[in-house]
Amino acid sequence: MGSMSIWHWLVVGVLVLLLFGKGRFSDMMGDVAKGIKSFKKGMSEEDEPTQPAEPRPTPRLQQQPPIEPNADPKLQPMQDDRPQH
């Protein structure tokens, strides 16, 4: 008995027909065909040259208000505590 003889394929075919049914299997194949057509259409649309969009001017940033010194006397600038080499 060889592997994948004609009888094996017939049994597999009957099981597929029983599980999916005649109409359901053809519907699935139709959906696959629609997907392939849609994919091909999308690929052909990408090949068409597109005109680059006009560059928009960059928005100017508004000047920020100057930093006011902090009036809190407890605050001091950070000290560098790294060891000197």
Swiss-Prot record:
HAMAP family linked: TatA_E
Subunit structure: The Tat system comprises two distinct complexes: a TatABC complex, containing multiple copies of TatA, TatB and TatC subunits, and a separate TatA complex, containing only TatA subunits. Substrates initially bind to the TatABC complex, which probably triggers association of the separate TatA complex to form the active translocon.
InterPro entries the record matches: TatA/B/E, TatA/E
Lineage: Bacteria, Pseudomonadati, Pseudomonadota, Alphaproteobacteria, Sphingomonadales
GO biological process: protein transport by the Tat complex
Summary of the function given for this chain in its UniProt record: Part of the twin-arginine translocation (Tat) system that transports large folded proteins containing a characteristic twin-arginine motif in their signal peptide across membranes. TatA could form the protein-conducting channel of the Tat system.
Protein name per the record: Sec-independent protein translocase protein TatA
An example Gene Ontology molecular-function term: protein transmembrane transporter activity
Compartments in which it is found: Cell inner membrane
Alphabetized Pfam families for the sequence: TatA_B_E
Region: Disordered, residue numbers: 39-85
Family affiliation: Belongs to the TatA/E family.
TM annotation in the entry: 1-21
Keywords per UniProt: Cell inner membrane, Cell membrane, Membrane, Protein transport, Translocation, Transmembrane, Transmembrane helix, Transport
Recorded GO CC terms: TAT protein transport complex
Membrane topology: Single-pass membrane protein
